[in-house]
Amino acid sequence: SLLVSADGTDLLVDAGISARRIKQSLALLGLTPDDLSAILISHEHTDHTAGLATLLKHHPIPLYATGGTAFYLRPRLPQLDSCLRPVSPGSSFPVGSAQVTVFATSHDAGESVDYRVDCGDAAVGILTDTGFVPEPAAAALTGVDLLVLESNHDVEWLRSGPYPYSLKQRILGQRGPVSYTHLRAHETDSYL
């Protein structure tokens, strides 16, 4: 979970921790879930949606997600249809003082996306859980002031870790998480 705040607009990107932890983290910033302008969901996997059901049960927050993600979330979120604002890769929409751009990622999920958030002269790009950086993602992230890039993939740790063989193969596949070796230091200039 990540909070992007600017000019009175507070966007929660994913809700991968419990609703209680989200509330505690927001409280440290002087915020409550009712202060959130929206929740942006990248995909349906539990590590991105664990706190979503409880959060939405008590707080009617607009939820932006793709149709593919909504399809998989619907059985777990009875209130989904009342708060869902469907988005699609390549779309852009305003939330408060921010302009949000949606771009596709490569992940083994229903319809995985990530986001660029522009507000005034500043731009933040978020890129998580992608097996590689698709061209539309690279284009959307070009020129951002801050790039939040998940880079916790370690092939040796994965191979020697406790996961079942089938999960290891899935993660090691092209649509698994991006490895820090795929975006080397000298390549970052092309995105910033």
For each feature predicted by the language model, list its residue ranges.
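Active-site neighborhood of phospho(di)ester-bond hydrolases with catalytic His/Asp-centered motifs
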Residues: 13-16, 37-44, 66, 125-128, ...
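Short, glycine/acidic-enriched loop or turn micro-motifs at the edges of active sites
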Residues: 17-19, 46, 131-132, 153
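Conserved beta-strand hairpin/beta-sheet module of binuclear metal-dependent hydrolase folds
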Residues: 1-29, 113-128, 146
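Active-site metal-binding motif and surrounding structural segment of the metallo-beta-lactamase
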Residues: 19-65
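Short, well-ordered alpha-helix to beta-strand connector turns
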Residues: 36, 81, 144-145
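Active-site-proximal loop/helix segment associated with metal-binding centers of metalloenzymes
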Residues: 100-176
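Conserved small/polar residues in nucleotide/adenosyl-binding loops
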Residues: 181-188
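Metallo-beta-lactamase
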Residues: 67-114, 118-121
